[in-house]
């Protein structure tokens, strides 16, 4: 077995942990972006419904 590889094992674990953290934050950011975009779309639809309801009342 190559013992030199085991000397770098803690560094490899830190790199793996950092990569995992970066990916997790990236996915969380995408989810937040998608939710904001969806909320904006829903608000637009609700505003259009209100306008149509006001036109029917007039």
Curated annotation (Swiss-Prot):
GO terms for cellular component: membrane. It is a single-pass membrane protein. Keywords: Coiled coil, Membrane, Transmembrane, Transmembrane helix. The chain crosses the membrane at residues 9-29. Its main location: membrane. Residues 29-58 form a coiled coil. The lineage of its organism: Eukaryota, Metazoa, Chordata, Craniata, Vertebrata. This is Small integral membrane protein 11. It is found in: Membrane.
């Amino acid at each position: 077995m190559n013992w030199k590889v085991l000397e770098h094992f803690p560094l490899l674990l830190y790199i793996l942990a950092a990569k995992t953290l970066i990916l997790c934050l990236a996915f969380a950011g995408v989810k937040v972006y998608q939710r904001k975009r969806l909320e904006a779309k829903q608000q637009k639809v609700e505003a259009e419904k209100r306008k149509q309801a006001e036109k029917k009342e007039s």
